[in-house]
Amino acid sequence: MKLNEIKDNEGSTHSRKRLGRGIGSGSGKTGGRGVKGQKSRSGVAINGFEGGQMPIYRRLPKRGFNNIFASDFVVVSLARIQAAIDAGKLDAKATVDAAALKAAGVIRRAKDGVRVLADGELKAKITIVVAGASKPAVEKIEKAGGSVTLLSAPAAAE
């Protein structure tokens, strides 16, 4: 067997059924939709309509709400910061903040600020100024000889 001799198993592929292409095709005129009625018309079926049965979105209760004041932080791991330092995109000697992370391509935009999580290892000694950091992340940064400064929420928004 050669690469140019490989083909699908017999009967595993079917040609597309072309609807509404004349009476001789066997599926012309109404194209398998029957005669008249809502389901024979063009356009898709009504979303969420279950044939008169009470639809699922009305059977289940409403739950929760969206807090318009919730802070939306961009999450950055220590591994991503270390990778940016190793690649020369981030200067470990300078203060690492949201603007520096954005310039390095680690984050796209700051939203309500940056939150650092402890995924991965940090070898570089960095001074980081962010809106939030997990306790393990702070411990790892301080263990590497760096420091963490947490911003208040309004100052974090840029």
UniProtKB/Swiss-Prot annotation:
Q: Name one GO biological process term.
A: translation
User: Which InterPro entries does UniProt cross-reference here?
Assistant: Ribosomal_uL15 (IPR030878), Ribosomal_uL15/eL18 (IPR021131), Ribosomal_uL15/eL18_sf (IPR036227), Ribosomal_uL15_bac-type (IPR005749), Ribosomal_uL15_CS (IPR001196)
Q: Which SUPFAM superfamilies match?
A: Ribosomal proteins L15p and L18e
Gene3D superfamilies tied to this protein: 3.100.10.10
Biased composition, class Basic and acidic residues, residue ranges: 1-13
**What GO molecular function annotation could you give as one example from this UniProt entry?**
rRNA binding
Signal peptide location: none
Pfam families reported for this sequence: Ribosomal_L27A (PF00828)
- Write down the superkingdom of origin: Bacteria
* Record's keyword terms, sorted: Ribonucleoprotein, Ribosomal protein, RNA-binding, rRNA-binding
* GO CC field: cytosolic large ribosomal subunit
Q: Where is the composition biased (Gly residues)?
A: 21-35
Q: Where is this region: Disordered?
A: 1-45
Does the entry feature the keyword RNA-binding, yes or no?
A: yes
State the function annotated in the UniProt record: Binds to the 23S rRNA.
Family to which the UniProt record says this protein belongs = Belongs to the universal ribosomal protein uL15 family.
Subunit details for this protein? Part of the 50S ribosomal subunit.
The protein in question is named: Large ribosomal subunit protein uL15
Q: What is the lineage of its organism?
A: Bacteria, Pseudomonadati, Pseudomonadota, Alphaproteobacteria, Hyphomicrobiales
Gene name as annotated: rplO
